[in-house]
A protein has these predicted regions:
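TRNA-recognition modules of translation machinery and tRNA-sensing kinases, especially anticodon-binding
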Residues: 2-187
Length: 187
């Protein structure tokens, strides 16, 4: 007795799911910045020390360059990028100011605790022109935060240090539980 096989095409599935919340947030940020005139640039997840550290003024003695903080591959000749900043460097090597770039993607650090994971997503922008001020950067950040979370969100800027920006700050938003949550660094 022969077995009959159904060779008809599969039924179309109407609801195929939805965008992951991380991708939704990344797309929202990127689309907002595109509306402000930023251009999307992309770069590799496997980087060299030159682009990931050296060109960003991160000294050889900096703790972030140690094996316990960075995922090195290929006999330590390459690494999984620890931030999306190398993408900006690559963009600046290709285009002269004025320029406005954004990039988004996965980054990797040897962090694993209640508030950190070894892989996370980052969106980063750079704007280079004459007569650009920190006040303009703050205004842009307020516009982004209010667009994403509403104008009733409370935020604060805290002075910080990043080897590749001066001045630098970290930005926190106040959670519904009354705790400050760091959401970005800038400079």
């Amino acid at each position: 007795m022969s077995e009959h096989k159904d060779i008809s095409p599969p039924k179309l599935i109407k609801d195929r799911g939805s965008l992951h919340p991380i991708n939704h947030m990344k797309d929202s940020i990127m689309n907002l910045l595109i509306s402000f005139g930023f251009e999307i640039v992309d770069g590799p997840e496997i980087e060299t020390e030159e682009f990931n550290f050296d060109m960003l003024n991160i000294k050889k003695s900096h703790p972030a360059r140690q094996m316990h903080d960075t995922f090195y591959v290929e006999n330590k000749s390459k690494l999984l990028r620890t931030h999306t900043s190398p993408v900006q460097i690559r963009g600046m090597l290709k285009k002269k100011p004025p320029l406005a770039f954004i990039s988004g993607g996965k980054v990797y650090r040897k962090d694993d605790d209640a508030t950190h994971l070894p892989m996370f997503h980052q969106v980063e922008g750079i704007y280079v022109d004459e007569n650009v001020s920190f006040a303009q950067l703050k205004d842009l950040i307020y516009k982004i935060i209010y667009s994403l979370f509403g104008e009733d969100v409370e935020l604060r800027f805290r002075p910080s240090y990043f080897p590749f920006t001066e001045p630098s700050a970290e930005v926190d938003i106040l959670s519904k539980e009354g705790k400050w949550l760091e959401i970005l660094g800038c400079g």
